[in-house]
Curated annotation (Swiss-Prot):
InterPro entries: Dextransucrase_DSRB. This is Protein DsrB. It comes from Yersinia pseudotuberculosis serotype O:3 (strain YPIII). Belongs to the DsrB family.
Length: 63
């Protein structure tokens, strides 16, 4: 996923939320995405771990 991609994010206790990627930072353990959400337009950071399905919080928006 890259900047300006539409994505969904997993948050605590609720359905996946739609947003837009503002920034991407890669690390050896995974990738951090700054995602703009309706109630957080400046963005919230989410981290996707490399080798963990449970640690995947950002995914592409299914069309």
């Amino acid at each position: 996923m890259k900047v300006n991609d539409r994505v969904t994010v997993k948050t605590d206790g609720g359905p996946r939320r739609e947003g837009v990627v503002l920034e991407v930072e890669e690390f050896s353990e995974g990738v951090m995405y700054l995602v703009s959400l309706a109630d957080y337009p400046a963005g919230v950071w989410f981290f996707n771990e490399v080798d963990s399905q449970d640690g995947t919080f950002v995914g592409p928006l299914s069309q």
